[in-house]
Amino acid sequence: MRLIDTHSHLFLEEFSEDFPQVIERARAAGVTHIFMPNIDSTTIEAMLSACSVYKGYCFPMIGLHPTSVNANYEKELEIVARELKFSKEYVAIGEIGMDLYWDKTYLKEQQIVLDKQVNWALEYDLPIVIHCRDAFDYIYKVLEPYKKTPLRGIFHSFTGTAEEATRVLEFSDFFIGINGVVTFKKSHLPETVSYTHLTL
């Protein structure tokens, strides 16, 4: 079975001690690709370095993570825009989306940032990788106007309901990423996976 890790932050400091071993175990387990999203401007260099070491196996993405959206978001977006303009290395825009789990202080800003990055995805013909935490309806509201466009991507680490999964799959070129949460006793994901006929 071929596996693709659509979202990994293995370039972060906490994984530095055994990073090579993690890659070896991933290969042995059948993982053929690892896609790495930065978080914000502070993690771009480390991400690109990791992807350079494992070129052809680890692939870089670029974007502004919703939990990094604050009053300074415009400067962060300028950096993302510059990276997209001057580098052809990036395989996707991500991870992007909305996260209202912690608080809703920057809800409006998160919507603005998401919409901007969705437009870049269309401009540069790149897929998006979406982070969604307690924010499905808000994200769907941003994405819905793009339903008839070539926009494509994946909701990584999807934990939504069967109804929400169905709404995602209304987009002709969107996928849902399922991770270990599906094994939790109280998880409703097995029902969601069954309902949408997803292949794990």
Predicted feature locations:
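Short hydrophobic-acidic sequence motifs that mark active-site Asp/Glu residues
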Residues: L3-D5, M61, F175
